[in-house]
């Protein structure tokens, strides 16, 4: 049960946390363009929680699963 809850929170953060720096500063992580996420994946994600969140968003985008975030957007 704990893992399911954690995954839900991980996804929720993508529609609530904003990018803290760079060209896409203040944009929701879920709204970052795929080409930027690909660049970050090649260049290296930042350390810590933000890097983990960006890596998750990259995986979601790369696998064509952005639609998974739509119900979470509607909740907010």
Predicted regions span which residues?
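DEDD superfamily 3′-5′ metal-dependent exonuclease/proofreading module
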Residues: 1-76
């Amino acid at each position: 049960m704990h893992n399911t809850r954690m995954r839900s929170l991980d996804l929720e953060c993508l529609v609530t946390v904003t990018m803290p720096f760079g060209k896409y500063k203040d944009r929701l992580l879920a709204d970052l363009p795929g080409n930027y996420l690909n660049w970050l994946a090649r260049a290296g994600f930042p350390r810590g929680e933000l890097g983990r969140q960006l890596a998750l968003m990259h995986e979601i985008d790369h696998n064509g699963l952005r639609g998974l975030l739509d119900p979470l957007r509607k909740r907010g």
